[in-house]
Amino acid sequence: MNSPQEISILFFFIIFLDYVSAQSPPPPNLYATSDLFKPSLAIITGVFSIVFTLTFVLLVYAKCFHNDLRSETDSDGERIRHDRLWQGLFNRSSRFSGLDKKAIESLPFFRFSALKGLKQGLECSVCLSKFEDVEILRLLPKCRHAFHIGCIDQWLEQHATCPLCRNRVNIEDDLSVLGNSSTSLRILNQSETREEDSRLEIYIEREEGTNDGSSRFSSFRKILKKSLLLEREGNENIDEKKLMHKFNHRIVVSDAVFKNRWSNITSSDLTFLTSEMLNSVSSDRFSSVDRVHRGNLRDKEDMEMKRMLIKHKDSSRRTVSEITTVSREKAVGGSYRGSTASTSQNYAVTATTEERRRRLWLPIARRTAQWFVNREKSNDLNTTRQNLNV
């Protein structure tokens, strides 16, 4: 009886050992720890990727779009800002590719000596050298900035923006701003006879500023060049150089404004017909009339004086007594004073009439210019809205 019990106990012991061996912990997995770190590593990689992408997008935005949007004036409005933004999004590669050589050569150019206005001390913002009368300048019609023809050609081969204001150069849009003036401007310097007979007049408008210029062009070389320039131009007007900026300018092509009739003026020319230009033209116009009138009055007075002197000599010969001589001299003096009073009265009436004409003409010219400008802006807004609706 003992043997079966021993056998059963041994049997249960063997089964227990098998069960315990079956429940023993498995050997440690070498890949368990790596599996635990895989999700956290993926999260870290994703976060770094997102941060890098956002940083890259912000840098591209600041480089490509921020300067262009900042260069727009407040009068252009939100329409131009959105157009420039979309152009930058879809034509990002063309911004840095430059322009074609034929497109660059199609831009208008002129001689610096043909430029009228306060052009003394004006410098090229590409090479930082002063313009000379014999040099040829190329004009960017949209922003109205001019540079040395060699400097701007090399710049436009590598860039598609203006080196001064960073506005994009679009050949078709730029030439449409000038209209017929662009063709005559390109032909201007092909022959000296054309330059003399041409009706084209080019004026410069410069911003007020100090001699220091823009901070973008401040460098040690520019400071040395400025000191040499002051030494060479000691005889020039110092106050005028202090008031005018050396780089910031605008070229106004005014073949229609000053030479043609009002019916032939285009809206693009009237855009730059400011009140200062109207005041200067009107003052020159009426001051010339006054000068002619004053010259005629002086001639009449001289003739009257000569005639009275001749009469005085004849009367002194003919008179017998001093009483008659004195009376005749008084008569002559009275006639002279009467003629002087009449001429001064005529001059006052003429000056009043000319002043009245000037006051009537200036508001009409201003309203006409403003009407053309508003019509051009409304046409541009309608065209933009139609394109957006399509």
Curated annotation (Swiss-Prot):
State a single Pfam family of this protein: zf-RING_2
Q: Signal sequence span per UniProt? A: 1-22
Q: Tell me the compartments it is located in.
A: Membrane
Membrane-spanning segments:
41-61
Classification via CDD domains: RING-H2_EL5-like
Enzyme Commission numbers on file: 2.3.2.27
Gene3D superfamilies with a match to the protein in the record: Zinc/RING finger domain, C3HC4 (zinc finger) (3.30.40.10)
In what pathway does it function? Protein modification; protein ubiquitination
> Could you identify this protein by its name?
Putative RING-H2 finger protein ATL12
Gene name, please?
Answer: ATL12
